[in-house]
Regions:
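Active-site oxyanion-binding pockets that recognize sulfate/phosphate
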Residues: 4, 59, 63, 139, ...
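Alpha-helix N-cap/helix-initiation sites
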Residues: 7-11, 34, 163-166
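A non-catalytic, helix-rich entry segment at domain boundaries
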Residues: 17-104
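Generic recognition of stable, solvent-exposed alpha-helical segments in well-folded globular domains
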Residues: 9-13, 68, 72, 118, ...
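Short His/Asp/Glu-rich catalytic/ion-coordination signatures at enzyme active sites or charged loops
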Residues: 2, 54-58, 180
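C-terminal, charged and often intrinsically disordered regions of DNA end-processing helicases
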Residues: 1-7
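Short, hydrophobic/amphipathic alpha-helical patches that form generic packing surfaces
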Residues: 1, 12-23, 155
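Mg2+/Mn2+-dependent nuclease catalytic core
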Residues: 100-180
Length: 180
């Protein structure tokens, strides 16, 4: 059926915009124009409103409105942009920007205890001999649910980058209700 939902689209749009912000950082560290940023976000949301939503397909809502996605998404993005992590990225980690891996288009394969793993990191940052892997989350905190995902990221990075586990730090970055 190819259905999406409001929470899924908040996550998808947040990921897409953070990817754009990080790719912009590769070219410029100039401050982000808030008005243009919000207009860009609204255009992305308008495009996503053309998808088939669970909430309308099953008659929970008649129509999905832009504000139903915008409010939480802009909160997530503003939390990211005002976080100490983003400050660290643009002030310190930027030094190794040529080695950043931002939302690769394909899944990477790895092995863990003889099993194949397929992973797709949101953002990988080599910095001062370590690897930091950030995974953006816009939903509820659930450390148990995501711990296996973090192990997969660490295994992938170890396998492909020839790094020891102690030099790899996978991080769940919660964007809502505040950046954690």
């Amino acid at each position: 059926k190819g259905l999406t939902s409001i929470p899924m689209e908040v996550g998808n749009v947040s990921h897409d915009v953070i990817q754009s912000v990080l790719e912009r950082l590769l070219k410029s560290t100039a401050p982000i124009d808030t008005e243009k940023f919000e207009a860009h976000l609204k255009n992305i949301i308008r495009s996503s409103l053309e998808k088939n939503f669970f909430e309308t397909y099953y008659d929970e809502l008649e129509k999905i409105e832009l504000d139903q996605l915008f409010e939480k998404t802009i909160a997530c993005l503003n939390n990211f942009l005002s976080s100490k992590r983003f400050e660290w990225i643009k002030d310190k980690a930027i030094a190794e920007k040529d080695n950043w891996l931002i939302e690769p288009s394909k899944y990477g394969e790895s092995r863990l205890e003889g099993l194949k793993l397929y992973c797709k990191v949101d953002f990988l940052i080599p910095f001062e001999g370590k690897i930091f892997i950030l995974d953006w989350k816009t939903g509820k905190k659930d450390g148990g649910k995501y711990s296996k995902q973090l192990v997969g990221y660490a295994a992938w990075a170890s396998y492909h980058l020839d790094m020891v586990a102690s030099d790899i730090e996978p991080i769940i970055a919660y964007l809502h209700p505040e950046y954690e």
